Amino acid sequence: FGTGTHETTRLCIELIEKHMREGDNVLDIGCGSGILSIASLLLGASHADAVDIDPNAVDIAYTNAGMNGIGRDTYTVVSGNILADDELDKAYSGKKYDVVEANIVADVIIALTEKIPKYIKDGGIFVSSGIIVERLDDVLEALKSRGFALIEVVKDKGWAAVASKYEG
């Protein structure tokens, strides 16, 4: 995970490349190595905020960003649990992102569907993966129940990634 070789990472980047627009601002939840937010910036995002529950992810993501010529003026990484930390939740609720990305696991994505409407603009794109195909219907149902319309599902080797649009 986080190196670009795992199916979920490749599927997410494929969807980001298709659905993100140049100049979009991005929130990467569960950023790990930073690969999705860094790819988004390299593909033309104007700014990316990234968060991960593992404090080690901050230095790793900043190191990887630097290796790709991305500075802290366009990239911000913090450590915390966006599902449990009220202060972190408030910080991201104060912004509205064009694109929200999460490559985690189905259960966390389902939990995030309750929070993401606070972070995403109307018409914004949510790209999610880390979903085994057996859990895809559960994720799609959670998205639909929270005001997301399905744009596209891509699959590879038992994994799925979803692009959906927030319609409020």
Question: What is the predicted function of each stretch?
Answer:
Residues I53-E167:
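S-adenosylmethionine
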